[in-house]
Amino acid sequence: MIQQESRLKVADNSGAKEVLVIKNLGGSWRKFTNIGDIVVCTIKKVTPGGIVKKGQVVKAIIVRTKRGLKRSDGTQIQFSENAVVLIKDDKNPRGTRIFGPIAREVKDAGFVKIASLAPEVL
């Protein structure tokens, strides 16, 4: 379960390695988020020469969680790490590549560009 103060890995080439969740968007009393939800994050670890800087506040979409989720057809999908993709205000990704698989729920949430950049959509 992703909540405030959770540290997540970044699954794109924007230059960030790790982010810290500041706020879960989508409700005033919302405590947890899942795959396909948008969160506000701050950058904690970066690679040199990246697009983003340490301490910068950005929006991100959750693409993988350890908790996983159950689908309506009865299947359950679960990943080995919690990961996000950094997005701009127009919901397009900041990076040009995405690493690792993403869940189909990201595409269903309206992030078609992120799904097309991903090497595998589960």
From Swiss-Prot:
Name of this chain's protein: Large ribosomal subunit protein uL14
Gene name tied to this protein: rplN
Matching Pfam families: Ribosomal_L14
Highest taxon above the source species: Bacteria
PANTHER family, per the entry: 50S/60S RIBOSOMAL PROTEIN L14/L23 (PTHR11761), LARGE RIBOSOMAL SUBUNIT PROTEIN UL14M (PTHR11761:SF3)
GO terms classed as biological process: translation
GO cellular component, one term: cytosolic large ribosomal subunit
Organism (species): Spiroplasma citri
Subunit: Part of the 50S ribosomal subunit. Forms a cluster with proteins L3 and L19. In the 70S ribosome, L14 and L19 interact and together make contacts with the 16S rRNA in bridges B5 and B8.
Similarity comment text for this entry: Belongs to the universal ribosomal protein uL14 family.
UniProt cross-references to InterPro entries, sorted A to Z: Ribosomal_uL14 (IPR000218), Ribosomal_uL14_bac-type (IPR005745), Ribosomal_uL14_CS (IPR019972), Ribosomal_uL14_sf (IPR036853)
Keywords recorded for this protein, A-Z: Ribonucleoprotein, Ribosomal protein, RNA-binding, rRNA-binding
Function: Binds to 23S rRNA. Forms part of two intersubunit bridges in the 70S ribosome.
GO MF term list: large ribosomal subunit rRNA binding; structural constituent of ribosome
